[in-house]
Design a protein with these regions (language model features):
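Short aromatic/basic micro-patch
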Residues: 7, 46, 66
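A conserved structural motif in NAD(P)-dependent oxidoreductases
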Residues: 25-26, 40-52, 63
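A glycine/serine/threonine-rich, flexible loop-to-helix segment
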Residues: 7-40, 81-83
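Short C-terminal tail/terminal secondary-structure segment
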Residues: 57, 68-83
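Conserved active-site helix of classical SDR/Rossmann-fold NAD(P)-dependent CH-OH oxidoreductases
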Residues: 1, 53-54, 79
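Residues within well-ordered alpha-helical secondary structure of globular protein domains
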Residues: 19, 58-61
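Conserved SDR Rossmann-fold cofactor-binding beta-strand/turn motif
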Residues: 1-9, 60, 73-75
Length: 83
């Protein structure tokens, strides 16, 4: 199994966004980044790393034993598909 995270709030992503939008607060820069670069995002924000961790923990647990060979998108609704 694999987890495919979308834009996640990490130190590197925060620095990148601040470099792209200098002079704005971190919150303002993140909002602008999402609005300009991820306008289709259903959650409209960066993903918290703990949210990705929760998914990974579940996929690694015995409760997910029937999930095999899956790619799990955790990207906040950027990709719109119906399986």
């Amino acid at each position: 199994n694999s987890v495919l995270p979308g834009p996640t709030r990490t130190d590197g992503v925060e620095k990148f966004i601040q470099d792209v939008f200098p002079g704005l607060t971190q919150a303002e820069a993140e909002c602008r980044f999402i609005a300009e670069n991820r306008p289709t995002s259903l959650i409209g924000r960066l993903i918290d790393p703990r949210e990705i961790g929760d998914i990974v923990a579940f996929v690694c647990s015995a409760r997910a034993s029937v999930i095999n060979g899956s790619c799990i998108r955790a990207e906040g609704g950027l990709v719109r598909t119906i399986c």
